[in-house]
Amino acid sequence: MPITFENFKGSYLKKGKPIYVPNDFSLDLGKKLLRKVSRRYKFDPFFYHFKDGSHVVALHKHRENKFFCRVDIQRFFYSIKRNRVKRHLKAIGVPKPEYYAKWSTVRNPYPGGGYVLPYGFRQSPILASLILSESPVGIYLRGLPATITKSVFMDDICLSGMD
């Protein structure tokens, strides 16, 4: 008989989006995983949500430019499946990537099934950023010319330039 596991106390909707409240085990695991990823992966300077007051700092970088573009990735966290989390943790050398991926994901609240990264867990932002950074989007952002100002805050990408 399959055994169920719970890594959250409950969930609620905020602006129509499911938010998960981690239990004590998940809070502790999130703290450990945050440390492990931070020690093993260096984020590009245009990833702003790991700094104090970062959303304001990120936007100020764009103020002197003439043209502006903002991209919001819909359901970004909930599009990141457990296997992807495991694969990226393994790639940066985090021990027991299957374990951390299992306990960092929840059953997908949207159609599509599987287990996904939830909003509300302590480790979700750094895991989502790791995956975005190593995705074709992250590679594209790194390849943009220096004349383009770029910033990433959670699932929002801002680009700006003078021409």
Protein language model features and the residues they cover:
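Active-site-proximal segment of RNA-dependent polymerases
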Residues: F8, G16-R70
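Conserved polymerase palm-domain catalytic core
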Residues: I3-G10, H60-M154, C158-D163
